Amino acid sequence: MGLTSQLLPPLFFLLACAGNFAHGHNCHIALREIIETLNSLTEQKTLCTKLTITDILAASKNTTEKETFCRAATVLRQFYSHHEKDTRCLGASAQQFHRHKQLIRFLKRLDRNLWGLAGLNSCPVKEASQSTLEDFLERLKTIMREKYSKCSS
């Protein structure tokens, strides 16, 4: 049984509407998860949050939103890959060790979600100014909250 020509336009319309709804809904969910992760990260005070990271957010005037997300994910990946086993971050106590492992887990989650929003395979990151991880995450949280308010309106 084939589709009649009368049914095709309404079906395409329904598919287009469903796609737009799903895209907006996914944007909403992804941003909410990123903001929740950033909230958890900025509440944590670990030895690693005082270390420096390449601050791509300070020099993001001529970049697209997707490039900014891609570069943020890239510098976060560089940071947690380099500091995952850093003795300055691990601390001496079991509690400090646990906090560090939790920080790395949250950074990996944030990296994954930013890559999903960026939708790019790779992006170059030039050496820029440095800031603490804590300041970088606060600025990223502000950007994500602004995007969330635009996405949900």
Swiss-Prot record:
This is Interleukin-4. Its main location: secreted. One of its GO terms (biological process) is regulation of immune response. Disulfide bonds join C27-C151, C48-C89, C70-C123. It is found in: Secreted. The gene is IL4. Participates in at least several B-cell activation processes as well as of other cell types. It is a costimulator of DNA-synthesis. It induces the expression of class II MHC molecules on resting B-cells. It enhances both secretion and cell surface expression of IgE and IgG1. It also regulates the expression of the low affinity Fc receptor for IgE (CD23) on both lymphocytes and monocytes. Positively regulates IL31RA expression in macrophages. Stimulates autophagy in dendritic cells by interfering with mTORC1 signaling and through the induction of RUFY4. Belongs to the IL-4/IL-13 family.
